[in-house]
Amino acid sequence: MSMLGASEAKKRPIEISGYAIVAEDDKIAGADGLLPPSLRNDKDWEYYQRALAGSDLIVFGHVSHELEPNERGDQRLVVSRRVAGLERRADGWWWNPVRIMWPAVVEQVLPLGGAVAVPGGQGVFDMFLQIGFDAFHLSRAHGVKLPGGRSIFSACDRGLSAGEVLAEAGLSPSEKIALDPEHGVDMVIWRRAIRGGR
């Protein structure tokens, strides 16, 4: 086998998975833009951290990146218009999607493919709805509402539910997990019917 053939044989599909916990009204943050204590849940956090630890790349908005310390040293891609294109920094890759398209980022950052975790926020979630999620792990805190808060997707501000947005993006609910029944938190995993890397 040629060297090129050996390299191609090791390449994996790019699998993109979103992760979020929302209130009953599909908000991911309060009016101040921050995650309130009412959306913090230990079981959800443990699930989320296991998922990040098993990912090859984690895509954050710059605010989320700053608020969530990278204690494991995960490979991060920070979405920001503060950079000219795609830059390697001490704390990870920084990417301006206005200047460089996703396929070029993948070629540079994940040349052998792999699992991509997308924890948001809203602008990043909206962008990956267009790029294409393979799965979305949507936790919900029942009994919690955040009037005036930030929605998980901008389309929710126009009257669509998070589920309707995911369905329009080609995903379907495939599994429901009772993460923490005592505190009213469950998760629905949405998946694309035909899986495939980009």
Language model regions located:
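Enzymes that bind and transform nitrogen-containing heteroaromatic metabolites
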Residues: 2-198
